[in-house]
Regions:
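Left-handed beta-helix
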Residues: 6-7, 12-13, 18-19, 24-25, ...
Length: 67
């Protein structure tokens, strides 16, 4: 595992998280989501089912991303 997920975050099954990505407090990455390398998901971010996030993306606190 070459990425960081804070212990308060929840990662569903069938999720890809790229190398060097950081997922901070109280995030939820839902089934089928794909997050590229060297990304940062701020506190309380929700990545919905099947969403694709590219490389080097920063998503700030309290943001939800839907397909």
């Amino acid at each position: 595992m070459n990425y960081f997920v804070h212990e308060s975050s929840y990662i569903d099954d069938d999720v890809y998280i790229g190398e060097g990505t950081r997922i901070w407090h109280f995030c939820h990455v839902q089934k089928g989501a794909r997050i590229g390398r060297e990304c940062s998901m701020g506190q309380n971010v929700n990545i919905s089912n099947n969403v694709r996030i590219g490389n080097y993306v920063k998503i700030q606190n309290n943001v939800s991303v839907y397909e």
